[in-house]
């Protein structure tokens, strides 16, 4: 059918597929949609709104993947001019134009909320984009300038500006359409800010209308709406209260976690998690390269585990916006790249480096990806380490991104599952006093545990095999196991509801 969304692992292991031809319009293709389709040779898509990272992977027989329609105006030899009437919610980008040899002008007659427009390809007569209105946000300002700092829209000016876009969004919904994910992400905050502006002026009807749009577009910052003084006059308004409750259902992360279904036993035979021994030649090399024995020190096991984490926290800064490192995905290569380029690593790669350091020292360890209930739209996950303490006979939480670990009220170190359970039950948690982000921002229990990690402890996953280069750059890593609340996903070879299985001792 038209306008389908091909979800994660949608055709996983469908060995009967040899060729797939999609209709004219596809909403999106998600990670691993065709993974394991051993006979699939040809994929053909036309207009596709979104292709996820990892959408096309582990397809051993595929010979051709064809994507047509990604350029909106292409191969139109007689086209001279394009006019957009009215306001534009978003353009996507960067390539709108290609292979139009007579094209001279593209004119936007109204305002643009967000644009990613860049250079035209093979359009020798093209003079550039003309925008007769205002552009609130432009990713490529050399091609489409946005409002200057002096013109920055605030208060009533922003409210009036966003009011011109509200009918566009409502019209899309009225016709059964949807606003694409990236447009939701860019437009929801602006509608919320305009709602606040209307509320500050006592324009309740406009404020509630814009707040409703912001929420439908994905606004989920419960703390903002709960604490915003501009909403004080509306606190007793039933319509406002209903809207706040909608935000709470997705944005009050501790509330969402507490409402999650419980885990339960999974009687299926599942493979054991494994840990590469420190005698492996690559791990021996890691131990020698970093001089890990010196870093760990001569203290007891817990002090050694902490020392390794603290050393990495200081050696490589956390940079959540950094891309994938262009090197082999092992601790030595990533460390050398960071020193050579003066760059940092995001939480995933920091956790991979720490994982190899722990394994090299003989501490069984996994890096655990922690994700929110809205994992399919929320890209802000977090990755930490769980390392086995023989001294305590249990897993413990170590986070090199924030130099963080967690204990109960008696000082007992906890693992991610125990932290999750205590958040749900409202039991005491203690974050180490020196937890911090790059020695710039102190971390608190309220911010780090009760907000950020409460959001990201809804769903957990880890690789079955923990080893040197657990996630190679070619994507050939071992299978991942997801621990999810009962009923959140169907049980599969990848998903379990059994927390005891997931936290099994090495």
Task: Briefly describe each language-model feature range.
Residues 1-5, 15-28, 38-50, 57-70, ...:
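Structural signature of tandem-repeat unit edges
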Residues 221-241:
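TPR/TPR-like alpha-solenoid helical repeat scaffolds
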Residues 258-345:
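Secondary-structure boundary elements
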Residues 352-428:
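Hydrophobic/aromatic-rich core segments of domains that either
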Residues 425-506:
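Low-complexity, Gly/Ser/Thr/Pro-rich intrinsically disordered linker/tail segments
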């Amino acid at each position: 059918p038209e306008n389908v969304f091909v979800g994660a692992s949608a055709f996983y292991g469908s060995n009967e597929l040899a060729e797939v031809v999609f209709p004219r319009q596809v909403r999106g293709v998600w990670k691993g949609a065709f993974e394991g389709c051993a006979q699939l040779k040809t994929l053909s898509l036309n207009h596709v709104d979104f292709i996820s990272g990892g959408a096309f992977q582990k397809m051993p027989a595929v010979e051709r993947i064809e994507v047509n329609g990604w350029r909106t105006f292409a191969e139109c030899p007689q086209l001279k001019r394009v006019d957009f009437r009215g306001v534009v919610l978003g353009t996507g980008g960067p390539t709108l134009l290609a292979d139009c040899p007579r094209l001279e002008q593209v004119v936007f007659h109204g305002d643009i909320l967000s644009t990613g427009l860049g250079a035209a390809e093979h359009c020798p007569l093209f003079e550039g984009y003309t925008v007769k209105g205002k552009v609130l946000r432009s990713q490529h300002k050399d091609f489409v300038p946005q409002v200057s700092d002096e013109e920055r829209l605030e208060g009533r000016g922003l409210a009036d500006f966003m009011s011109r876009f509200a009918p566009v969004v409502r019209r899309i919904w009225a016709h059964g359409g949807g606003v694409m994910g990236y447009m939701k992400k860019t437009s929801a905050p602006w509608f919320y800010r305009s709602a606040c502006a209307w509320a500050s002026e006592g324009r309740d009807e406009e404020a509630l209308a814009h707040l409703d749009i912001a929420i439908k577009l994905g606004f989920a910052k419960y703390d903002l709406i709960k604490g915003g003084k501009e909403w004080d006059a509306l606190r007793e308004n039933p319509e406002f209260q209903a809207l706040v409750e909608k935000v709470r259902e997705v944005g009050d992360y501790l509330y969402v976690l507490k409402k999650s279904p419980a885990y339960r036993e999974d009687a299926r035979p599942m493979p054991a998690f494994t840990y590469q021994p420190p005698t492996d030649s690559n791990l021996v090399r890691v131990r020698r390269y970093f001089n890990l024995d010196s870093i760990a020190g001569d203290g007891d096991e817990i002090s050694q585990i902490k020392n390794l984490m603290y050393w990495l926290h200081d050696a490589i800064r956390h940079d959540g916006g950094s891309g994938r490192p262009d090197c082999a995905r092992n601790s030595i290569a990533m460390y050398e790249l960071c020193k050579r380029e003066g760059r940092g690593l995001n939480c995933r790669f920091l956790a991979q480096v720490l994982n190899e350091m722990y394994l090299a020292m003989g501490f069984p360890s996994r890096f655990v990806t922690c994700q929110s209930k809205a994992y399919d739209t929320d890209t802000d996950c977090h990755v930490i380490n769980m390392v086995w303490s023989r001294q305590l006979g249990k897993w413990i939480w170590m986070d090199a991104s924030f130099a963080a670990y967690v204990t109960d009220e008696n000082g007992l170190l906890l693992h991610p599952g125990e932290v999750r359970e205590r958040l749900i039950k409202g039991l005491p948690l203690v974050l180490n006093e020196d937890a911090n982000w790059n020695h710039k921002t102190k971390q608190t229990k309220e911010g780090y545990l009760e907000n950020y990690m409460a959001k990201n402890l809804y769903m957990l996953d880890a690789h079955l095999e923990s080893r040197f280069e657990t996630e190679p750059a070619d994507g050939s890593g071992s299978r991942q196991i997801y621990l999810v609340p009962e009923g959140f996903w169907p049980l599969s070879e990848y998903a379990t509801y059994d927390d005891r299985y997931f936290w099994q001792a090495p």
